[in-house]
Design a protein with these regions (language model features):
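Alpha-helical transmembrane segments
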Residues: 17-21
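A residue-level marker of the well-folded mature domains of exported/periplasmic proteins
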Residues: 2-12, 22, 27-277
């Protein structure tokens, strides 16, 4: 998977949004110190570089490492100082990191949250200090102090994931068209979804199910475990270990310990896929 290429475009957009937000808030450009945007791209009024805090959820996924580095590189190329932190999928760690970014003088925050509802205190502090906040990929909910949201069309991403499963099962071509010589079924599959506290996860799942449902309805595909709702298949924090435990339980309870056929598994994330495998 070309992680950098796929997600790098969104990282570039986030860097552009950050630069634009700084300009709109009066943090960038020429200040009392006499620096101009042509000199550094982001000179603060005291002559120093403007600092941007970038909070990413984890380094256990190549995707988040690539995204964090891409945002950092884009902002540094524009002349900003960047404090990039990864939180190891631990909510208290991320809240502490964001608190520290604010204390250290960050003038804008780019946040890919672990839990989009767990940052109220940090967001309120940012709002009181007029620090713009960009929610990166994962929506931060229930707080008015989020200024921008940068993400994909996550339903369409889910459609692509569902189509990838159909293609892998030999039911469609790479463009999603039914094949005349496709297997008749029934083919056993199981479903996995992302974290229930991540707004994106439900969109991924709904998008995938929109293309899988016709095959489930006509019996070509069968979810043998019967676990077909988002709540039944969601993996908290997108964690590989949680996905592995669920897959092991499914194989034991539904597939005779692995002796019965399982044709494919829907997975929305590389880390979950590694746990499944």
């Amino acid at each position: 998977m070309k992680t950098r290429g796929f997600f790098g475009k969104m990282a570039t957009v986030a860097a552009t949004f950050a630069a634009g937000a700084l300009a709109l808030s009066g943090c960038a450009g020429g200040g009392a110190g006499g620096a101009s945007s042509s000199d550094s791209g982001a000179a603060a009024s005291n002559g120093g570089k403007v600092k941007v805090g970038v909070a990413m959820p984890t380094q256990t996924s190549e995707r988040w490492i690539a995204d964090g580095n891409a945002v950092k590189e884009g902002l540094e190329a524009a002349g900003y100082e960047v404090d990039l932190q990864f939180a190891n999928d631990d909510i208290p760690t991320q809240t502490q990191q964001i608190d520290q970014m604010i204390t250290n003088g960050a003038t804008i925050l780019v946040i890919a949250s672990i839990d989009g509802t767990a940052l109220s205190s940090q967001l309120d502090t940012a709002g009181s200090k007029n620090i713009p906040v960009i929610a990166y990929d994962r929506l931060i909910r229930d707080n008015e102090n989020v200024d921008f949201y940068v993400s994909f069309d996550n339903f369409k991403v889910g459609v692509a994931q569902g189509n990838a499963l159909l293609f892998g099962l030999g039911l469609t071509d790479k463009d999603g068209k039914k094949l005349d010589n496709a297997p008749k079924g029934p083919l056993n599959i199981e479903l996995f979804a992302g974290s229930p506290d991540d707004n994106n996860a439900k969109f991924f799942f709904d998008g995938a199910m929109s293309v899988l449902k016709p095959y489930l309805d006509d019996g070509t595909l069968v979810v043998k475990s019967g676990q077909t709702s988002f709540d039944q298949v969601a993996i908290l924090r997108w964690q590989q270990e949680v996905a592995q435990k669920r897959m092991e339980d499914l194989l034991t309870s539904t597939y005779g310990g692995g002796s019965e056929p399982l044709a494919g598994v829907l997975s929305p994330f590389d880390g979950i896929s590694r746990g499944i495998i």
